[in-house]
Amino acid sequence: MKKYKNILLGCTLVLFFVFATTFTWLYSQINSALPMLDGKADIFGLSGTTVIERDGNGIATIKGEQRNDVAVALGFVHAQERFFQMDLLRRNSAGELSSLFGPAALKHDKKIRRHRFRERAREIIKHLPPQQLALLKAYTRGVNQGLELLKAAPFEYLLLQQEPVFWQEEDTVLTIFSMYIDLQFEYGERELTLGMIKNTLGDDMYQFLNPKGSRWDAAIDNSRYPQSPIPVQGWQANSAASHSGKTQASPSHYQDLALPGSNNWAVSGKLSENGSAILANDMHLNLRVPNTWYRASLEYRNHENQAVKVTGVSLPGAPSIIAGSNGDIAWGFTNSYGDWSDVILLETNEDNSQYLTPDGYLPFTTYKQVIAVKDQQSVEISVRDTIWGPVIGENYQGQMIAYRWVAHDLNAVNLNLTELEQAKNTDQAFAIAATSGIPAQNMVVADKAGNIGWTIMGPIPVKLGDIGDVPASWATGENSWSGYLSPDLYPKIKNPESNRLWTANSRVVGGEMLDKIGNGGYALGARASQIRDNLREKSRFNEQDLLDIALDHRAKFLERWQDFLLTKVLTPTALAKHDQWQQVKTLLDNKELKATTDSVAYRLVRNFRLNVKNQLFKGVNNQLATVDNGNTYDTYVIRHQLEIPLWQLITKQPLAYLPPSTSSWQDLFEQALAKTVEDMTADQALEDATWGQQNTAQIRHPLSRAVPFIGYLLDMPATELAGDKYMPHVQNNTFGASERMVVAPGFEHQGILHMPTSQSGHPWSPYYGKGHDDWVKGKVSPFLPGETEYTLTLSNY
């Protein structure tokens, strides 16, 4: 017996030793991947000493002799803090995730390879102006030396059992291509869906589901467009069969998924306390660890030997300050949702080897693509191109389609945005915007002299023929793109009479300017109208006033739904049938609806609306899914304009649209409310079913789902969040303001800037997670970096 005890003890000691050794090695490796914060480092490619200072939150101030030196240092800190994030961005657009993650990413890689983004990135690099190429080379040198000077590879590679691959100049272009993928439709989903709606349901229904305007419109030029009338015939799909199947009521359904967007607004110097214009900007993106942006302040001397200081947010993978202030101007962006692409119906010969063009039938150009797959053999695929763009598949009728997209052209990407760092006024910013290569954005700019302006930053195609919302053939030559809009013709507005500007992903202008921009799927104007109304309520502003607008979570959009519930649904008859509904009425009565974490009323109204929408549009969604033979095209891609026909239907209540599972419109509303209450009270009392309980942060690292227990170290706290989608304070579980910035150029010391997660991508960093709570609570946190706590000096060798 004693012998077995000794063996057991020996085995235990061996196991403990192995565990301790493994843990010590693992700890050492992860600890070695921490960035250099203090001391000195010798770096190749600097013209002089460059200093990287960090404050207690890790916010970097980079001081160099010239812009290229600062680019080296910015690349250095990006690599040391965020290389894995940069790697994912380049691999995402290049279709190279499989080499990192294995077969799980192969479907994505095969699909995205149709765009051949790495080949396009290489071509763009060849055509960059010498000064921009030099800047990009400097940044790349910094990235690779920053990666090399880590004592161990970033911890993610240890977990994946991979080695990081050095950065190339083309990878910065791929990073920007990933932003194109995030901000625009890479497969023409919206046009394909609208084309299917028009062909399947008819033109009247197409106009009804895709209205040009509504009461929510808040264009800065006060332009208005009418909503479309309700077609008489009703849903063609309104049969019991089309409504069969499970009605969605999952948590994801109740998220009512948002679209990448943003808010920005500005007031001129005539309305500010110091004479400078003031800008506010919060860019809405999917939230993850680490955050999309990296905060930085860059100081250098330009070619005229003038001092430049620019502060804001940078994108790891690129050498520019994306949004910020330079003392003379401040600028920020919202996604424009203009029409930057077109789906082309190809007319092919019998064996699909050729397609018809204005010059007759031409053969497809075929490209071989080899996809490396972790721990497996490489996969080889072929992709086809046309004179207009890549073949991206077939439409619902089986017709081959190609895609014409700004992202495929040489002017899709350049580094002109970097010139904003030295712009002196709004007019100079306008000129830079009109030549910049980024996914087209609404740029709002404010300058120290008090001027404000709006324009589009990014390429604007000039379109000929009848193209736009739905797929069309280009075979005859009547439909085409004729280059890009010249800078002098760009839409812009400067110093409007109101001294106020605002954009929020909805339609910004009408008339000729709208004709140039087009409609690529505008958001409903609910956010924009609430921002506009807030701006109109005051005649004087400071930075706090603009932050208050960013944090406004009053549910103005849902007020009419609250009233509808109280007056049309919670009738005496309905209250008599449902005992619990008196409590619902009490919760809703005489309350200003706000998306606060403790609000039960907000959650009730919001989820009731979604259940009504889901039930009402279920038949047409199912019909489109059936016609499309199980593919993913449905009204999801036009969901943000569906509020307009939805409200028309519930107020007019035409019988032709009543779902067969309901006996009357009142029955539909009562079913929707019953489902709402049932879901909210599944495991708790109604009074405990708060909005914060549903809207709890799930801001995670990409690896936390795949590696057991690591989320405990990497993910942000599961905090209840105020705010929602159809209000300025956009904040959901995994989506929201990736930064909030308020700044008056020349008065940056009074500015405000905070963002989720933190500067660091390493969980053992001394500032990991610092600043996140400011973002959650909307605290005033300084725009400029704080006192220096860490200093790293880079010297040339």
What are these regions (language model features)?
Residues 70-73, 111, 120-133, 402-404, ...:
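Second-shell loop/turn segments in exported
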Residues 10, 22-278, 283, 289, ...:
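Substrate-recognition/specificity elements adjacent to catalytic centers across diverse enzyme folds
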Residues 64, 69-101, 332-380, 479-527, ...:
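Gly/Pro-rich active-site capping loops and adjacent beta-alpha segments
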Residues 605-690:
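Charged, long alpha-helical assembly modules
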Residues 436-538, 604, 608-616, 625-626, ...:
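Hydrophobic alpha-helical segments
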Residues 298-320, 324-329, 333-478:
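Glycine- and hydrophobic-rich flexible loops that cap the catalytic core of alpha/beta enzyme folds
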Residues 516-517, 521-577, 665-797:
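Terminal end segments
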